[in-house]
Amino acid sequence: MIKTTAMLLEELSEYGSPKSKLSRMAKRGEYFPIKKGIYETDRHTPAYLLAGSIYGPSYISFEYALSFYGMIPEAVYTVTSATFEKKKKKKFETVFGTFTYRDIPSDAFPLGIRLLQEGDYFYRIAEVEKALCDQLYTVSPLPNKKELFLHLTENLRIEESELKKLDTLKICEYSAAYHSTNIKKLCSLLRRL
């Protein structure tokens, strides 16, 4: 369970020095710091459940979400998340894993996000179409649809059969919010598959 320093200090208020007690408990592995002011009580909590608490507003996307949905064959160990108007990439290394955050356009940010629950944890993750749009937004403009198709199938290793399952209408609707030639080309490419 995620707890703030204030919550833990309140729980430890009967001790003479709650801050010292918290520090000792963290050193003994009873609490695990996620970032300054935030702790997790269970060392075995999957990293993706913590991503939204580290930096936000954010949601899981890019390679991690594509792997989550089985679009790309590789396992992704860094939890990749989308943010907006932060102006720079952020990276956090914790005992739970590595977390990276990067911007997408603010108009695109609220589109295509799912809120999921796992036990007592809630987390936000991009729908598969949105994760692919976010991923392509980070790529330098590709010259044509053929190069885009090669990028999708060779670099990202997405099977053509998986591309055909995507909701083309959603991607075409999302493309207006990104102002990205790659996403416009993806819309056009998917209409022809």
Language-model features: where?
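Exposed, interaction-prone assembly regions rather than primary DNA-binding/catalytic cores
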Residues: 70-127
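Short, compositionally biased low-complexity segments
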Residues: 25, 33-35, 102-109, 147, ...
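Residues at alpha-helix termini
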Residues: 27-28, 67-68, 177
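Hydrophobic alpha-helical interaction segments
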Residues: 113-193
